Amino acid sequence: MGNHKAALTKQVFTFASELYAYGVREVVISPGSRSTPLALAFEAHPNIKTWIHPDERSAAFFAVGLIKGSERPVAILCTSGTAAANYTPAIAESQISRIPLIVLTSDRPHELRSVGAPQAINQVNMFNNYVSYEFDMPIADDSKETINAIYYQMQIASQYLYGPHKGPIHFNLPFRDPLTPDLNATELLTSEMKILPHYQKSIDASALRHILNKKKGLIIVGDMQHQEVDQILTYSTIYDLPILADPLSHLRKFDHPNVICTYDLLFRSGLDLNVDFVIRVGKPVISKKLNQWLKKTDAFQILVQNNDKIDVFPIAPDISYEISANDFFRSLMEDTTINRVSWLEKWQRLEKKGRKEIKCYLEQATDESAFVGELIKKTSEKDALFISNSMPIRDVDNLLLNKNIDVYANRGANGIDGIVSTALGMAVHKRITLLIGDLSFYHDMNGLLMSKLNNIQMNIVLLNNDGGGIFSYLPQKESATDYFERLFGTPTGLDFEYTAKLYQFDFKRFNSVSEFKNATLLSETSTIYELITNREDNFKQHQILYQKLSEMIHGTL
């Protein structure tokens, strides 16, 4: 029980402190039992004024008045059950009037939902027609991830508290008995302010100078979704900053010495450098290892996204800007240059040696990477690659090294559904080659009908390892050996030659990399090129590459 109280105290005191950090100075509380933890946290906070009103409908409108008068966001808090429903009129008013009302509804813990417990209704998404953002918070526990969720969600929600996107937001907060936090732990209640510059359309370079004047910086660029990227290259050239470029950034098309492509394999093989600051541009990167590093590094992080909703994954940045990458970097060009030559050269040496190891590996490899490497070689500048999720996009991330081709993928939800159909839609306007695994292909075989009915030409390179190859890289492979093949390997034994006949595609099967090397990808027809691979062999050969890169890293640093 002591651990529960400590976890509850940490959670609600952190939540109250984060609200203060984003500008909340007043909270209107409608008394109730389930809201006890937060009510006490707000009451104990030295710089938050609490108002008490027993009628939730009136309390919410009173808060609307506070916002109008103070021009600051104000929070309202109620207990669980029908009490929350009384907030609806004021929330609707706030939506139409673009008023930053923060709605906090206390809730029963998950085990008391939908079982007939008293004062328990479905409060999740209950205001979804009227709020700009909503989230069902995790229940208090001892994990760091639960506290991080508060930081992440407040970072995301804060964009609706100020600027052009103002409007009401809703946090539903479940609490488990006992409900009283430790009121002696007031040192957890902080009054620090968060900087909110991500609504600026221009940048005050002087505000960032103390960060950008440090030597060890990185630019990390994810999916840019057709945005212009030339100023990223220009800034990197002037200020000697390495660019870790995701394959969807479209920066790998440029033969630029500062563009680093092998970073995923480098981090996967043990690279861990001290970095002063990181400028993250665009959507989150594909690389799991780079995202894990971003989550743990102490580097100051700047996020640049030209979206009205920022994507903070894998961790909330220190500062974020809603602005195009070109405008952001252009605004920083007048700063004095910093001597970072040795820092940049260290990354360039790693990149050069990493590429050499990859080249040597591909010359003798017989796994899926070797097939993907050959596909990249065969793809002309007139063609674009559409890459399926799971293993194909990861292999392309590792093997696409400065070739002038466009790469596309569905990296919103990262699912394997609808890949064939999305690629065919693109093939109406571009020459597309689809790289896809057998399970993803099976999942959307019906999508091929559009090609048959409308004569849409597209080549499909089908990596067939008869199952889910990516699961071989996850802990389940070792911890659930007796069940792995049935639950995760999921072999289907399908013969896709019949699929090709059904939808009038040409079909060619390759049982080895050497066979595929001699093949020609025809652009004037629709062909399925099936590449037969072995999951276990693929995993083992990848481990050899990781080991060689690890040895190279330790010999270079």
Swiss-Prot record:
Top-rank taxon, per record = Bacteria
Q: Which reaction does it catalyse?
A: isochorismate + 2-oxoglutarate + H(+) = 5-enolpyruvoyl-6-hydroxy-2-succinyl-cyclohex-3-ene-1-carboxylate + CO2
Say if the entry is tagged with keyword tRNA processing: no
Is Transferase one of the keywords UniProt gives this record? yes
Note accompanying the cofactor annotation? Binds 1 thiamine pyrophosphate per subunit.
Hey, which pathway is this one from? Quinol/quinone metabolism; 1,4-dihydroxy-2-naphthoate biosynthesis; 1,4-dihydroxy-2-naphthoate from chorismate: step 2/7; Quinol/quinone metabolism; menaquinone biosynthesis
Pfam name, any one: TPP_enzyme_N
What are the BP-aspect GO terms?
menaquinone biosynthetic process
A Gene Ontology molecular function term of the record: magnesium ion binding
EC number(s) in its UniProt entry? 2.2.1.9
Cofactor(s) needed, names only, are: Mg(2+); Mn(2+); thiamine diphosphate
Q: Which UniProt keywords apply?
A: Magnesium, Manganese, Menaquinone biosynthesis, Metal-binding, Thiamine pyrophosphate, Transferase
Q: Which family does it belong to?
A: Belongs to the TPP enzyme family. MenD subfamily.
PANTHER family linked: 2-SUCCINYL-5-ENOLPYRUVYL-6-HYDROXY-3-CYCLOHEXENE-1-CARBOXYLATE SYNTHASE, PROTEIN PHYLLO, CHLOROPLASTIC
Assembly and binders: Homodimer.
Purpose? Catalyzes the thiamine diphosphate-dependent decarboxylation of 2-oxoglutarate and the subsequent addition of the resulting succinic semialdehyde-thiamine pyrophosphate anion to isochorismate to yield 2-succinyl-5-enolpyruvyl-6-hydroxy-3-cyclohexene-1-carboxylate (SEPHCHC).
Read off the NCBIfam families from this record.
Answer: menD
> What protein name is recorded for this chain?
2-succinyl-5-enolpyruvyl-6-hydroxy-3-cyclohexene-1-carboxylate synthase
